[in-house]
Amino acid sequence: MALSERLKKFKIVRKILYAIIGMVSYPGFMWVNKLTISGTENIKGLPKENVLFVCNHQTYFADVITLLHIFCAVKWGKENKLGVPYYLLNPFTNVYYVAAEETMKSSWLSKLFTMAGALTVKRTWNSKSTEKRRGLDPSDTRKIQRALEKNWVIQFPQGTTTPFAPGRKGTAHLIKMNRPIVIPVIIDGFSTAFNKQGLKFNKRGTRLSVQFKESLPVNYDAPAEEILDQVMTAIGQKRL
């Protein structure tokens, strides 16, 4: 097991990383750009385990960092705002996020983000290879399932930052197998404000928005295609 994989299991390591990443990123969300948040009443009071957040995807890192900020703020009793980031003194760390393995190995910074709670999975398709897999590797699926047992998990069903890309059935199968509470999240403005990695500014003064919707009334026994269609509609990514 890689060092980063071992370290992220220690909450104190993740708390320190959250505090550092949070302080560095906060000005970009709140001062350089303008973040608006809605729907945090839908995540307040959720259990600390078996909650799956499904979200559209606009940048590699800024999306996730923003969600982590919000989760920490909600833990401290804030509603639909970040306010002064004193929540970073004791951040909420019962959360993991699914990320492509190749992305998280691409630089020292991405390896640092891995220790903040990344569940690295192999892409179902790699632009540098002719190989195309039909779904998640079984070991990747088990990794996400284990995380859900005691934590929240953030997943991007499209697996890409391309808008209106089709969703992956792996998300639906995960929902069928684990029967989590499913919270749809819609984000906007991040692809305008930041570069693809989400680490550099493209356009300052951009309105960033994050909306948490009510939990999906999922029929866990429905076909995977039906569940996936429900998820994609909820996150505003179904082509009409």
Model-derived segments and their meaning:
Residues 2-39, 66, 107-116:
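A transmembrane-helix-recognition feature enriched in membrane-embedded lipid enzymes
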Residues 14, 28-34, 98, 129-135, ...:
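Short, flexible loop segments at the rims of nucleotide/cofactor-binding pockets, characterized by
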Residues 36-39, 105, 137-141, 167-171:
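Amphipathic coiled-coil/heptad-repeat helices and related helical stalk/stem segments
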Residues 41-47, 144-146:
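Short amphipathic alpha-helix with an adjacent loop that forms part of the alpha/beta core around
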Residues 47-131:
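Catalytic core of membrane glycerolipid acyltransferases/transacylases, capturing the structured
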Residues 118-164:
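Internal catalytic-core helix/loop-beta-alpha segment
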Residues 147, 230, 234-238:
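C-terminal alpha-helix
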Residues 149-154, 159-226:
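A cross-family acyltransferase "interaction/gating" segment
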